[in-house]
Amino acid sequence: MSIKAFIFDLDGVLTDTSDYHYRAWKRLADELGIPFDRQRNEALRGVSRRRSLELLLDGRPATEAQMEEWMERKNRYYVESLEGLTPDDLLPGALDLLREIRRAGLKVGIASASKNTRTVLDHLNLWPLADAVSDGYSVERTKPAPDLFLHLSLIHI
């Protein structure tokens, strides 16, 4: 069987948006009067937005309505901060590798648990190099479940 496609995770493989997330969580924490620094932020990496907020609150009481509002606010801050994201924020070698794969006639799939994947791809100008995208809207279960990758295989990537 020959290789027909490559599937890439977005964050940490093609780009690194961790600082954008940190600044959004920091802004929310400051508004809520909760101490928050980069060391505390490390516990939020790779964790869902809800679980991240629970870790940020560290046992402080909150209603479901507050939780929803704070998660939405953090995401809004994050998306606003992405306005500064450009193709220069691709990790070294990522663009060259994607172009080489396409020149070889192979397909490229991008899999990310984020529901902001499409916004990130817009700012990185990666749409011309992606044959298919699977994101947090594409599947019910995201990582560590394999559904993002299985979704791409189902659409023949």
For each feature predicted by the language model, list its residue ranges.
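Active-site neighborhood of HAD-like aspartate-dependent phosphohydrolases
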Residues: 2-42
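A short, structured active-site edge motif that brings together acidic residues
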Residues: 40-45, 128-142
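A metal-dependent, Asp-based hydrolase signature
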Residues: 46-81, 95, 99-100
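Short, acidic loop-to-helix structural element flanking the phosphoryl-transfer center
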Residues: 80-110
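Conserved phosphate-coupling serine/threonine residues in phosphotransfer and NTP-handling enzymes
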Residues: 112-114
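Short loop-to-alpha-helix "cap/lid" segments that border enzyme active sites
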Residues: 143-153
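Conserved small/polar residues in nucleotide/adenosyl-binding loops
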Residues: 155-157
